[in-house]
Amino acid sequence: MSDTTTAENTNEPRLITETGLDRRVADIIEPVLVDMGFRLVRVRMSGQNGLTLQVMTERNDGTMTVEDCEEVSKAISPVLDVEDPIDKAYHLEVSSPGIDRPMVRRSDFIRWQGHLVKCETSVMVDGRKRFRGKIVSVDEDGFRLERDQPAYGEEAAVAIPFTALSEARLILTDELIRDALTADKKAKAARAANENFEDEDTDNE
């Protein structure tokens, strides 16, 4: 797994975005999230428990706490009430991407290089649209995948352009859980240290 800096992640555009009503909601709430120091991962309307608006987000450092979810919910709820993009009663659900997260930005592929991912493309790539394997390298235009179960006659490695990507998600493994928990712990420790430093500066003024 590779580290990426907060600066590199700030305002980085998503490779995979919504359509229709989901896109309208995303356009409304994303500026609010950015101002708060969060990144939008995904918006999805679901018929679960009536009608549920699922908003997946994270801090620029990749962390997300229960308190963060509550903060985001309180911030975007009144904005959605004013803009009123949904003409039915719905339940707002804010969550983190989770360990087996959707991969929606180039930095996601860089950060989780070496881990297993499953993805779909909007066009045929190397004779198929569905892939599963390890991310072995990432460049400006796409990533290289080493298939863990190549079909007979297929090369194990395949290059997938970001422009062809329609969906991608990490596959849960023991290695992913270990690395994700380690990264989360480091990021939260760094944030706490930074907040303590800022508090000391304020006290000295």
Swiss-Prot record:
SUPFAM superfamilies found in the cross-reference section: YhbC-like, C-terminal domain, YhbC-like, N-terminal domain
Record key words, sorted: Cytoplasm, Ribosome biogenesis
Listed InterPro entries: Ribosome_maturation_RimP, RimP_C, RimP_C_sf, RimP_N, RimP_N_sf
Main location: cytoplasm
Entry's Gene Ontology BP terms: ribosomal small subunit assembly; translation
Superkingdom of the organism of origin: Bacteria
Pfam families: DUF150_C (PF17384), RimP_N (PF02576)
Keyword Membrane included in the entry's annotation: no
GO cellular component term, pick one: cytosol
Protein location: Cytoplasm
Stated family: Belongs to the RimP family.
PANTHER family: RIBOSOME MATURATION FACTOR RIMP
Functional note: Required for maturation of 30S ribosomal subunits.
Protein name: Ribosome maturation factor RimP
